[in-house]
Amino acid sequence: MSNYFQEFPVVDYKFGNEETTTRFQHLGTAVDILHQVKEYAVYYQKYHIQNGERPEQLSYKLYGNVNHYWTFYLLNDHLRQGGWPLRDADVYPKAQEYYPNTVLAVDGVAMQQELKVVLGKIVWLPTQEYLPMTKSTVFVTGNYLYFPNSKVAGKILKIDQKMAMIWTDAVGVRGVDTQCVAVTAEEGLAVIADPEYVPVNQYAIMQIEKKWDEFDAPHHYEDVEGNWIYPSYSTTFPNPFDHNSVNTMNSVSYYQRLLNTNEVQKEISVIKADNINRVVSEFNRLMRSSN
């Protein structure tokens, strides 16, 4: 804890995505007067945080004192909001931790099913009724997906209609599954409990075009100018999507986005060493006058 602020109230504060909290002065007070301190902007300089460099280490490197680390957070909004940058080697495992689910690119067409008698058995078979995913009442967040060949099921966590993509917490979905089946939560949970269980009610199916681990899935697609683009779709009902209209050259994965964001976090403003004591003293004065 910095010696300069011991007289002020402290709270357990979590910076961005940091896993642990830091005992830090109440940021409500600090941020309220930050605009007054920024009159010292002429005394700042840009700094690129080195791989693995921690706040206290950088404070000592710049000022010969570990207690000035707090200035980095107060001067840089993105550090307060997003946390201190990760070590490069930690970005990939952190992406796997942050994005643990399965993502499906689908054709966006729900093929309805109905019960029929085949060779004396009652089975669910496709009808000739097709609906865009936007109009489906079963391919919705909160329902479950069943993957017959993999014998697994999972909850629908999110649907992006513009990208024709579905997020699910299903574990163990294999490439042999080219279709997913919409089932109720009750039946999805039954499959999770017993992989040999076959759902009785299989209301609709949808074609799977691509499958990714979430961290490796497209967060979005970009053109050469960095503008976001989306898979094209047919103007003819039921409006199937064409995922070949975008490719890996256009894709920015969740991992790549985290990597890019981590690089941005490394670019900060720091107070020049010959001005640090003056700025800190003035900041302390402002803190006292605000109480």
Model regions and ranges:
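Cell-surface/extracellular proteins and modules involved
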Residues: 1-291
